[in-house]
Amino acid sequence: LSDVVTEAKADGENYILNGYKSVVMNGPSANKIIISARTSNSQLDENGITLFIVDSDSNGLAKTNYKTVDGRRASDLTLENVSVSKDNIIGSLDSGFEILDSAIDKAILAISAEAVGAMEVLYKTTVEYTKTREQFGTSIGKFQVLQHRMVDMFMEYEQCKSLLYMATMKHEEGAPDAKKAISGLKYQVGKAGKFIGQQAVQLHGGMGVTD
């Protein structure tokens, strides 16, 4: 978070921003964009980062729009002498890191909850499909080797759900190890999501790759 190279230099009642911001989700349709810029100290210092609200049609702001792998839209931004009023600072000068740190923890929890919900749908849909798909005169859900794979899907999902509840409670309570719990959740959700998704595709056979 502290590796910020975009710079903001004071210019009277404004700041002049120069730099780059990548992967701005929903950037193509955004009217305003939050930019983190360094207003003091060195590149990797946690202090000296300030958040600015920037109009997307500001002079000197250029967008490169593209689709993401999940079908959403994103933008990469280039800022060249973009003038922003001091009134557009979020919080106070040089305090952006604390705001970002808190917001990202909440974002990880929210996205993880979405992912855990997707895992549940994948697992349950796969179980139901194997009850109706037949091979060799019986439903494939009765094949022990496939049952083992679905048990693994269930266990990965349940572990992630438990981690999600635990990390969320620690965050809300302000527990000293909340960040550790959130980091563990982020890792496990990514690992389990990939595993459950792959198993769902494979157990659906040809249906798993049919649009």
Predicted regions and their residues:
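A gly/ser-rich beta-alpha-beta helix-loop segment of oxidoreductase catalytic cores
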Residues: 1-10
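Flexible, small-/acidic-enriched active-site or ligand-binding loops
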Residues: 3, 55-91
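Short, structured patches in soluble enzyme cores that scaffold and shape functional sites
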Residues: 10, 21, 37-39, 53-56, ...
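Alpha-helical interface subdomain recognition
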Residues: 10-16, 76, 97-211
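Short beta-strand micro-motifs in enzyme catalytic cores
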Residues: 15, 33, 50, 73-78
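A short core secondary-structure module
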Residues: 18-62
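Short alpha-helix boundary/capping segments
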Residues: 25, 44, 67-71, 104-114
